[in-house]
């Protein structure tokens, strides 16, 4: 989220869509609550996604970056409300300031059909990440 939010040009009236700071706060909260200390590398798909986002920024393809923001951030807005009820911690990443209907409407004004292919790529990267995490979980036992 941090890389995406740095790369995309977000209109000032939509800055409240940003999640990176809240995600960081959620991670810190869970680290403290469960005495966790993250170790190891991220799955390869995280690095692949990051490279893809920076490539779009280098190409000045803000339209494509906004497609990724729509998929990721509005997934948190919609499905995240259910997830928040089921996870430990405050789940700040799922909280959006202000009128969410207005936020959705204003962001959708930036979208068009030409962004569909890039939105699909965003889903593909997410699927790749979930596959990698599933394989890792098969090989590890985590005590919380």
Question: What feature does the model see in each segment?
Answer:
Residues 1-144:
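Metal- and O2-centered redox machinery and metal/ROS homeostasis
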């Amino acid at each position: 989220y941090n890389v995406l939010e740095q790369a995309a040009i977000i209109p000032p009236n939509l800055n409240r869509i940003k999640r990176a700071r809240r995600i960081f706060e959620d991670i810190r909260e869970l680290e403290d609550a469960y005495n966790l200390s993250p170790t190891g590398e991220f799955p390869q798909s995280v690095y692949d996604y990051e490279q893809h986002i920076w490539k779009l920024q280098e190409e000045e393809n803000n339209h494509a970056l906004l497609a990724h923001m729509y998929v990721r951030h509005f997934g948190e807005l919609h499905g995240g409300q259910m997830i928040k009820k089921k996870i430990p911690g405050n789940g700040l990443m799922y909280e959006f300031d202000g009128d969410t209907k207005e936020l959705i409407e204003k962001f959708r004004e930036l979208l068009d059909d030409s962004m569909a292919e890039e939105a699909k790529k965003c889903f593909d990267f997410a699927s790749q990440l979930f596959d990698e995490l599933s394989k890792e979980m098969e090989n590890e036992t985590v005590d919380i």
